[in-house]
């Protein structure tokens, strides 16, 4: 109850900051919870209850592991999942989003804590929360599409590497002579400390990894990470193995989260401002990406602006109640959907169950071996790395996109996300401007002959055919313009691309999603008049072969003839 009494004034301040005219047009900031409750029923509540409990069980070991990877205490991970998880579900723009600490923040949070302490982290997170609220109020939810696919793929893979490097010490039971902050320094210290490897710790870590790999193949309901925690804790405790546990390194608290105002100074604000911006951008990208994945799974559409406001409120409250940055978690959101969650109530139940865990079971967290925590984070890093996508982009993309991907990846590993995202975006923009400059020189482009393409202003289109014409270059900022399928009685979709001079990997990824959507709806996709550069990208990526050469036609008349055959 104290938590709600503290947070309500914050919501009131947000309301006062919005002009009267803006409040009259606030439907774009309507939480999905209100819509869900309009036709809520006992059956839906039971589904949300079951799903919320299961997701809480999944979130428990992850929240503890991610807290430790972030350089904070185990209970702070639960504080984050409870406070931010509840508020983001209650106020969010998605029906099924589950929020909490995620691996994406681990390295940046650990760096802030090492340099500026917990007060610095709290200030950075509050500032990030305010930025997210402003982004939502100013309807900037759609702006996230301007982050290229290559950058998100690059920094996600880079974050995965930093997590693995950061957990090598605990997995191998090593003793470091100093406490390095940067990833490169951690790797150097690991190599210098190889003589301190604890083989018993390695065995426990390998057992935890094996459980997480093998268990899901036979049992889906009980999370493998929880099984790994229970088995390794019992083994280390029962056999008195010489392996560090959480209790050996941290003092476990069962206190509920309480309001704590951080010490704020100009120096602190100036020091953490770049980190705050990075947290805000990362939270926006991760949460909206999770929403998109959820939309595809449940066939709904989220409210991106309301989601950003909820992320802002959740992160602000998390910081003030002792937590760390939070965002939508794709794995937990997918688990919520698969286990029957149908409304934001499931996320709120998940937070409530974690409160009970914090009060009743948290002392047992002291028994969890550190190699098991490292093994859990290894699996998190593997699952988030998207290494197959990473390699596919390198093999199939234009050289400019590959350059952006590799620059972002290496800068994330060697420096941090602040540098990686900034340099990656700058490079992507410069390469895009070069590409557009090349397009402007008409004689340098070889266009497919469009013979008999304009025999008449209007062409008869069969009733079972949809025709879309795309104009202008298709790059990362225009990928969202790719149409979605509204089938009805339609069996063929023609994309007329005579006015598309250039295509990048982000837009190609959008076309691939459209192709998959067409296949799900049994709609044939046909391309008309694809120019040289887009055709080269499609062939190099294998997309041309997937769609079939017979479905690429030189002009609209030939495309309509193909449609008549289907």
Describe each region flagged by the PLM.
Residues 383-541, 545-546, 564:
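The feature marks cytosolic C-terminal regulatory regions of anion transporters and related permeases
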Residues 99, 527-528, 553:
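Active-site-adjacent beta-strand anchor residues
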Residues 547-562:
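Short acidic-hydrophobic, aromatic-tinged amphipathic segments that line or gate anion-handling sites
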Residues 6-22:
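Short, positively charged and aromatic/hydrophobic N-terminal segments
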Residues 25-443, 447, 542:
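Transmembrane helical cores of multi-pass ion-transport proteins
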């Amino acid at each position: 109850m104290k938590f709600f009494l503290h947070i309500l004034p914050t919501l009131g301040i947000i309301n006062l900051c919005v002009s009267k005219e803006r409040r009259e047009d606030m439907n774009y900031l309507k939480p999905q919870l209100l819509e869900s409750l309009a036709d809520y029923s006992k059956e839906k509540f039971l589904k949300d209850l079951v799903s919320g409990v299961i997701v809480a069980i999944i979130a428990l070991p992850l929240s503890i592991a991610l807290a430790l990877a972030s350089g904070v205490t185990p209970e702070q991970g639960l504080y984050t999942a409870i406070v931010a998880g509840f508020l983001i579900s209650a106020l969010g723009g998605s029906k099924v989003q589950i929020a909490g600490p995620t691996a994406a923040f681990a390295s940046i949070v650990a760096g802030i804590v090492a340099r500026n302490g917990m007060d610095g982290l709290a200030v950075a997170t509050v500032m990030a929360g305010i930025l997210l609220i402003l982004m939502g109020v100013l309807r900037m939810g759609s702006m996230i599409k301007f982050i290229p696919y290559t950058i998100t793929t690059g920094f996600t893979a880079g974050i995965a590497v930093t997590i693995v490097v950061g957990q090598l010490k605990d997995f191998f039971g090593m003793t470091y002579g100093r406490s390095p902050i940067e990833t490169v320094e951690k790797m150097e210290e690991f190599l210098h400390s190889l003589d301190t490897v604890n083989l018993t710790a390695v065995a426990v870590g390998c057992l935890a990894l094996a459980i997480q790999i093998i268990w899901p193949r036979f049992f889906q309901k009980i999370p493998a990470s929880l099984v790994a925690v229970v088995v390794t804790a019992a083994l280390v405790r029962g056999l008195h193995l010489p392996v560090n546990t959480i209790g050996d390194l941290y003092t476990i608290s069962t206190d509920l989260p309480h309001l704590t105002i951080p010490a704020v100074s100009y120096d602190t604000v100036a020091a953490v401002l770049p980190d705050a911006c990075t947290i805000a951008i990362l939270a926006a990208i991760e949460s909206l990406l999770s929403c998109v994945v959820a939309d595809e799974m449940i066939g709904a559409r989220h409210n991106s602006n309301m989601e950003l406001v909820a992320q802002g409120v959740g992160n602000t409250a998390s910081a003030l109640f002792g937590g760390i940055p939070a965002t939508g978690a794709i794995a937990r959101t997918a688990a919520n959907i698969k286990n029957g969650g149908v409304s934001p109530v499931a996320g709120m139940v998940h937070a409530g169950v974690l409160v009970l865990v914090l009060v009743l079971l948290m002392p047992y967290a002291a028994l969890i071996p550190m190699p098991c925590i490292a093994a859990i984070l290894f699996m998190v890093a593997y699952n988030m790395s998207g290494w197959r996508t990473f390699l596919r982009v390198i093999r199939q993309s234009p050289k400019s996109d590959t350059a952006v991907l590799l620059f972002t990846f290496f800068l994330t590993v060697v420096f941090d996300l602040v540098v990686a995202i900034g340099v990656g975006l700058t490079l992507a923009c410069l390469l895009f401007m070069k590409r557009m400059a090349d397009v402007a020189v008409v004689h340098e482009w070889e266009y497919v002959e469009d013979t008999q393409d304009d025999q008449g202003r209007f062409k008869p289109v069969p009733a079972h055919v949809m025709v879309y014409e795309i104009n202008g270059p298709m790059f990362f900022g225009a990928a969202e313009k790719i149409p979605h399928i509204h089938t009805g009685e339609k069996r063929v979709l023609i994309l007329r691309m005579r006015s598309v001079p250039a295509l990048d990997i982000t837009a190609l990824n959008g076309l691939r999603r459209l192709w998959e959507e067409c296949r799900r709806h049994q709609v044939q996709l046909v391309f008309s008049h694809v120019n040289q550069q887009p055709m080269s990208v499609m062939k190099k990526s294998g997309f041309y072969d997937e769609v079939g050469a017979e479905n690429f036609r030189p002009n609209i008349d030939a495309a309509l003839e193909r449609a008549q055959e289907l």
